[in-house]
Amino acid sequence: MASKLSSLEVTIMAMGEYQFILFPTGNIPSISEDGIEFVGDNKYNFHHAVEVLQMSPHIKNDPTSKSWKTFDDECYFLYFDGKYKVEIELNSGSISEEADDISIRTKIYRDEGNVIEALRICQVLCDSLNLKCWDIKLRKIIDLDNVSNVAATIDQYSKLRNKS
């Protein structure tokens, strides 16, 4: 079984946003002309992810950030500390006991964007749910415990932000 995001979905989501896809450890990312697919049978517990998010400071369920009206409201969360925003989408917008992915997005060209907060949320979820982190812009898995990996992501975000 695989979680798959088409090139169009990634392009639509990623325009003006810095995005991370979290996926279960043991699954393998596979890039093709059709997009990225996370191949493997491993899943994470959807309800445990919701609990982790609900216990995190400044994170609330926020269905106003969902991509499509047909997606489930319970899948959308927003980090907002009064200044910065990070959108969180569980399981591509569908409730399921066993889930495939988590999308973490923050704005690049607006002051409300903050990649450091996005990375912090990625770290909490990866540690709590045994997930890996795919950086959409760098097109690779980043080790959130590796200073040079995190620095490369922050550098890429800064380069994109400075283009505006």
PLM feature spans:
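Acidic (Asp/Glu-rich) sequence patches and key acidic residues
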Residues: L5-S164
